[in-house]
Regions:
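Histidine-dependent nucleotide/RNA phosphoesterase domain, centered on the 2H-phosphoesterase fold
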Residues: 1-173
Length: 173
């Protein structure tokens, strides 16, 4: 079991349904496990829940609700598996995601930060062990000129096991 911090976006119903429709076809690893989200703190197995909750509550006080716009898909080789991922990348709101991520990786999480993996704010919408399939998925998305507007007003601290995500605390920005 690991702890993870997720930003679950507020989306218009049509955008949520469109994302879920795409994920149902192309997100074989996570569609049935977790809702559309942005990962702010990646799996941490070594910190207890109360300590992480306190840290996130303290760090989140520096932030308010913010908006983002997704307009572009990009593929990225997973750092944790042999899969390639398809990400929707926020064109607007990008810097706030980065600052939020950086604020979380201070104090007790400072040594958990993977400096060998660049942080790219993203919403995962697809994955496959065949990188060329992922490239085709991303090309399909980018041809559509998507524009998905959403907001982030809270962070969820979750327990993550292989096929299970359970929210243990919601922290409002």
């Amino acid at each position: 079991m690991s702890l993870v911090v997720l930003a679950n976006p507020q989306l218009e119903k049509k955008d949520y349904e469109w994302i879920q429709s795409f994920r149902a076809k192309h997100d074989e690893r996570y569609f049935k496990v977790v809702e559309p989200h942005f990962t702010i703190v990646f799996p941490v197995p070594s910190i207890d829940e109360k300590t992480l909750i306190h840290h996130v509550e303290k760090a989140a006080k520096r932030f308010n609700q913010f908006y983002f716009v997704l307009r572009c898909a990009q593929i990225v080789k997973s750092s944790f598996s042999n899969y390639t991922d398809v990400f929707l990348i926020p064109e607007e709101g990008y810097r706030i995601f980065v600052k939020l991520h950086d604020a979380m990786y201070t104090g007790i999480l400072e040594r958990e930060l993977r400096l060998d993996i660049p942080f790219i704010p993203h919403m995962g919408v697809g994955n496959n062990s065949d990188a060329f399939k992922c490239k085709a998925y991303a090309d399909e998305l980018n041809k559509k000129n998507i524009e998905i507007v959403g907001s982030i007003d809270s962070l969820d601290i979750v327990r993550y096991e292989t096929n299970s995500v359970e929210t243990i605390k919601k922290v409002y920005l």
